[in-house]
């Protein structure tokens, strides 16, 4: 659909569609440790979904589309959460830096993301085009139903 951007579609449907696209393309470099890692220190278990790396990459690409100029540190803030400390009060805890770094490096390998000259990383024009194309497909599928 012409004129449809990432902002115009449901974020959950878009992230699922982009994750499926990344998995189907087979070009995203997935580390071998993805089945044994926790995503943050406040998490108790590893993710149940075996395709979580594709979902995280899709979510990160969407975040860079909307805001841009985000680095590893800001990604750890986004994917952080509440650390439960037993009888002591809960506090905010950041997400894994290694996971955030590897996701951004994998997206750089696809030429969807590049390092910004100021700080962090930003979406390339090719990456923005891919995300808009997938958003158009999601909107067309939604309109069909």
From Swiss-Prot:
Q: Which gene encodes it?
A: RPS19
> Is Chaperone found in the keyword set?
no
Q: Which GO terms describe its cellular component?
A: cytosolic ribosome; cytosolic small ribosomal subunit; nucleolus
Q: Cite the entry's keywords alphabetically.
A: Acetylation, Cytoplasm, Host-virus interaction, Methylation, Nucleus, Ribonucleoprotein, Ribosomal protein
Q: What is this protein called?
A: Small ribosomal subunit protein eS19
Mention one GO biological process in which this protein takes part, according to its record.
Answer: translation
Residue positions, PTM N6-acetyllysine: 23, 111, 115
What GO MF annotations does this protein's record show? Answer: RNA binding; structural constituent of ribosome
Pfam family of this protein, just one? Ribosomal_S19e
Compartmental location: Cytoplasm; Nucleus, Nucleolus
Subunit structure, briefly?
Answer: Component of the small ribosomal subunit. Part of the small subunit (SSU) processome, composed of more than 70 proteins and the RNA chaperone small nucleolar RNA (snoRNA) U3. Interacts with RPS19BP1; the interaction is direct and mediates the integration of RPS19 in state post-A1. Interacts with RPS19BP1.
């Amino acid at each position: 659909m012409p004129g449809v951007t990432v902002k115009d579609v449901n974020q959950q449907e878009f992230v699922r569609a982009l994750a499926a696209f990344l998995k189907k393309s087979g070009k995203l470099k997935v580390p071998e440790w993805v089945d044994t890692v926790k995503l943050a220190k406040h998490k108790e278990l590893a993710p149940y979904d075996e395709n979580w790396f594709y979902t995280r990459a899709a979510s990160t690409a969407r975040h860079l589309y909307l805001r841009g100029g985000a680095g590893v540190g800001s990604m750890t803030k986004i994917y952080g959460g509440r650390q439960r400390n037993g009888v002591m009060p809960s506090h905010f805890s950041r997400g894994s830096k290694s996971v955030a770094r590897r996701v951004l490096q994998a997206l750089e390998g696809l030429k969807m993301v590049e390092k910004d000259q100021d700080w962090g990383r930003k979406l390339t024009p090719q990456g923005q085009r891919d995300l808009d194309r997938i958003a158009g497909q999601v909107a067309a599928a939604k309109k069909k139903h």
